[in-house]
A protein has these predicted regions:
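Glycine-rich phosphate/pyrophosphate-binding beta-alpha loops
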Residues: 87, 211-214, 396-400
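Non-cysteine beta-strand/loop elements that form the S-adenosyl-L-methionine
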Residues: 82, 203-206, 410-416
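An extended, acidic, His-containing surface patch that forms the Zn2+-binding/catalytic region
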Residues: 39, 52, 74-76, 187, ...
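Short glycine/proline-enriched loop/turn "hinge" motifs that connect secondary-structure elements
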Residues: 95, 138, 194-200, 283, ...
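Fold-level recognition of mixed alpha/beta catalytic cores in primary-metabolism enzymes, strongest
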Residues: 111, 115-117, 121-287, 423-437
Length: 452
């Protein structure tokens, strides 16, 4: 079937696809607590009369993962689309122009609501693409699999991690290419195709002091003062870490983007004028760290015996959580405090450290050897009418599960939406971006899978 025929199907069914997207956005799946089963049931209902087999795997309290399969054949080339059903909570609903679950459409151009950009539009587009391929009767030697997952916003272990281990691997289903639908727009640049991501590590650090009345502070040990000494020396952490080169230098990353905005002078002007682009590019080549939460003390006249901070680290591919932990322990020891691994019974003057949360970094370094990703890039460019570019993400995605486990190195993320809108109040998406993503997902799957 021709490209024009696929486009005609999309054009004829725009209203249907918009209503499907609205139904996903209107389904409460704020995480925490999750409630992703609400979304899974909407997807199942949408697919039930379209010849697409679905399987729902429930867990916990109203949570679930879902698989949709184009057919029953897994012997040839298989393509996997991954999208998460959970969204972050909306914060204060009073700050929203339109209710976060309203899926309000403005001027027939924008759709508003929590999850529009991150990432229910991509998920809807992936589901729509599998229905179009079924409708046109595509002949394949393999399968298109759409995996709608839970838990991405809280690490992904119960979602993509579980699905990979308990469905794909357990059933010996091998996939030759994986596409994760995270938003990849970076205004004012064209669409990016994302090859890798930084890892994250959140460390809880607790200083133990000794309480006393503040009229005699020398009788106690002030845990806040202890923490202030660590904070004061925190920027010295890099001295305690092994020297590792990032997978790409700043100049290499800039060159990746510049090819989409010729001539180079044009890109340099945009780069210098856009602090988000500049800071994001720089962050991709180094460890970034920030102390984001602190608590301590029980009363204004009591010497605090405990102070706690949460420290957020973003690791580039090649760095590990253990490297950061080892370096932080050495730094604290050199300050003069003992690091104790016990969670309780720490003596005054001791520091306790634990991993609060973490996620690995990941990258597909030799992407330029792949003809498949070049074909995908061409489809993106033809659909959007602009040059695309390869890049990395400063934020984490579920792509790491496929790359780092060895399941499928050839994993990228691409989706409708602008990263500025992710987790934002008044999150919104251009409807044309949604329709373009349907075209990209459908055309790529057709080219990748078709035996005609």
């Amino acid at each position: 079937m021709s490209v024009e025929s696929i486009f005609a199907i999309i054009e004829q069914n725009k209203d249907v696809y918009i209503e499907f997207l609205r139904s996903l956005i209107q389904s409460d799946s704020f995480n925490p607590p999750g409630n992703e089963k609400n979304v899974a049931l909407v997807i199942e209902d949408f697919l039930k009369d379209k010849g697409i087999k679905t399987e729902i795997f429930p867990f916990g309290d109203n949570r679930a993962n879902l698989f949709a399969f184009l057919n029953d054949n897994f012997t040839g080339k298989n393509l996997l689309y991954n999208g998460h059903m959970d969204v972050v909570p909306p914060g204060s609903k009073a700050d929203w122009k339109y209710p976060p679950l309203s899926a309000y459409i403005k001027r027939n151009k924008y759709i508003y609501g929590r999850g529009t950009a991150d990432m229910k539009a991509a998920l809807a587009a992936m589901i729509v693409s599998i229905t179009i391929l079924k409708k046109i009767g595509i002949k394949t030697s393999g399968n298109l699999i759409v995996n709608a997952v839970a838990d991405e916003e809280t690490g992904g272990k119960l979602g993509t991690g579980w699905c990979l281990d308990n469905v794909l691997k357990k059933r010996s289903i091998k996939c030759d290419f994986v596409l994760v639908g995270e938003a990849s727009g970076v205004h004012p640049l064209p669409k990016a195709i994302v090859l890798g991501e930084k890892g994250h590590l959140t460390i809880k650090l607790v200083t133990s002091g000794k309480s006393a009345h503040s009229m005699a502070p020398s009788m106690g040990k002030n845990a806040i003062y202890m923490m202030s000494r660590i904070i004061e020396n925190f920027d010295d952490l890099e001295k305690y870490l092994p020297k590792i080169d990032p997978p790409f230098t700043i100049e290499e990353l800039k060159e990746m983007v510049a090819v989409a905005l010729p001539p180079r002078e044009n890109f340099d002007r945009i780069y210098n004028d856009q602090p988000l682009l500049r800071s994001m590019t720089e962050a991709l080549t180094k460890l970034t760290k920030s102390i984001n939460m602190i608590s301590g003390g029980i009363k204004e006249n009591v010497i605090p015996d405990r102070c706690e901070v949460l420290i957020d680290f973003r690791l580039f591919p090649g760095q590990t959580s253990q490297m950061i932990i080892n370096g932080l322990k050495k730094l604290i020891t050199d300050i003069g405090f003992k690091v104790n691994n016990a969670t309780t019974e720490n003596l005054p003057g001791e520091v306790y450290l634990e991993i609060y949360s973490d996620g690995e970094s990941s990258v597909w370094e030799d992407y330029n050897k792949s003809q498949t990703v070049k074909e995908f890039k061409k489809i993106v460019e033809n659909t959007y009418g602009k040059k695309s570019f390869f890049f990395l993400s400063a934020g984490g995605t579920d792509s790491k599960y496929y790359r780092n486990s060895g399941y499928c190195k050839e994993t990228v993320h691409f989706g409708p939406g602008n990263i500025r809108q992710m987790h934002a109040t008044n999150e919104n998406l251009e409807l044309q971006d949604f329709f373009n993503s349907i075209k990209v997902y459908t055309l790529f799957a057709h080219k990748f899978l078709s035996t005609e």
